[in-house]
Every structure is written in structure tokens, then in C-alpha cells.
């Protein structure tokens, strides 16, 4: 995955209505893994930048035995799972290894988490009653699904912002194209030019990275 594949979404919160009483599109928790004994959590919600335009962000987390990371001094550290959110742990982790949520003074201002698992629970408990505008940042990737690729926007940080903050759905990525990529067929009639390019995406350990159409 390109290191520049990031997003910044600013707008109103959208929480989808559940399909039925037993299934929520917003938040779910279950036990999975090969023995179905690992606690897992997932959250998904939308950010609307206009009445006709929105995008959904998501995060998945699970319990681990420990967290492996690099501290502020560049040393490799292994943190026991039960110590992941202690003050000592959060002090040694660099910003890019933490998940930050600040929903404002009514919610205790800034909260830091060492794992998605805990951030997800906090968001699920507090976003249900949140009123206002949000800024959500994170990374963007493409996942293969039934022969096609689905855009995924993975949450890193969530902030409450002022109501007059300009809404936007912004992507930042490395975009690759060739001399044949520009389509000017609609330039005169629609005043539009299309660029058919590619983004670099890490697939897996065996495949490595590939260029996918965007």
C-alpha cells in the first residue's frame, strides 16, 4: 500500500439503521478465529459532506496476547495486552502507533488507545448520542471481493470540529498513469476529462504489491 494513501473526511455523522434486532451495521462484537474464541469488534459509520454525498469509514479490532511496536526511541517493544492502555505504555508509543479520539469536553476531550479494539468500543458507546460535526482521518485501501475491488476507509483518528468547518471527502494517494490514460471524449460536451490510472496496493506476503485500476 502506498504510504500516501490517506483520507480526511469532514462532515455530519451517519449511523445506519440496523437490518434487524439481531444485526447492527454500526457496531458488532463476536468471537472468531480458528477456534472461535478470540473476542473481535467492528464499527462502521458514515460522514456526509453534502445532502447527496457521503462515505463510510470502518475499523476492525481483536484481542491479542501482546502488542508489538517501536517506541519513541526507535526500540522494538512488546507490550502485554493487559498493559496496552496504561499511562506508561501510551507515553512511549509514537503518534502513528496510537488511535486518538476527541469528541469534545462533554466526552472528556482527548482519549488515546494503543489498539483499535478499545477505540472501537469507545466510539460505539459515545457516537450514538453525538451531535455535531466530525473529522475522521485514516488510511485507504482496496480489498478484493467477488472478483472486484472495494474501497475501504480505515479509521485512525476521530475529532469533533466546529460547525462552520468546511465539509469535505478528501483522498491523498500516489496515482500512476501512462500517456494513454487520459480520456477526452466528453471534454467538449460535458467539459470533463477522465484519467484512468492505477494505485499501488499491497496484496499479501506471496504476491507483494500490485498496481490496481482506480
PLM feature spans:
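OB-fold and OB-like single-stranded nucleic-acid-recognition modules
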Residues: 1-214
Amino acid at each position: 500500500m502506498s504510504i500516501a494513501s490517506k483520507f480526511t473526511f469532514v462532515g455530519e455523522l451517519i449511523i445506519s439503521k440496523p437490518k434487524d434486532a439481531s444485526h447492527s451495521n454500526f457496531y458488532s462484537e463476536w468471537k472468531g478465529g480458528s477456534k472461535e474464541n478470540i473476542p473481535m469488534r467492528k464499527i462502521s459509520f458514515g460522514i456526509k459532506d453534502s445532502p447527496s454525498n457521503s462515505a463510510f469509514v470502518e475499523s476492525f479490532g481483536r484481542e491479542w496476547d501482546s502488542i508489538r511496536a517501536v517506541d519513541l526511541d526507535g526500540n522494538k517493544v512488546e507490550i502485554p495486552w493487559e498493559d496496552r492502555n496504561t499511562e506508561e505504555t501510551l507515553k512511549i508509543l509514537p503518534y502513528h502507533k496510537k488511535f486518538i479520539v476527541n469528541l469534545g469536553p462533554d466526552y472528556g476531550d482527548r482519549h488515546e488507545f494503543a489498539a483499535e479494539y478499545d477505540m472501537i468500543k469507545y466510539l460505539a458507546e459515545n457516537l450514538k448520542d453525538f451531535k455535531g460535526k466530525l473529522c475522521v482521518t485514516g488510511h485507504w485501501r482496496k480489498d478484493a471481493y467477488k472478483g472486484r475491488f472495494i474501497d475501504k476507509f480505515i479509521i485512525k483518528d476521530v475529532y469533533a470540529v466546529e460547525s462552520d468547518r468546511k465539509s469535505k471527502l478528501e483522498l491523498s494517494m500516489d496515482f500512476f498513469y501512462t500517456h494513454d490514460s487520459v480520456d477526452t471524449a466528453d471534454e467538449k460536451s460535458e467539459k470533463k476529462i477522465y484519467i484512468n490510472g492505477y494505485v499501488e496496493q499491497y496484496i499479501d506476503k506471496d504476491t507483494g504489491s500490485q498496481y490496481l485500476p482506480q
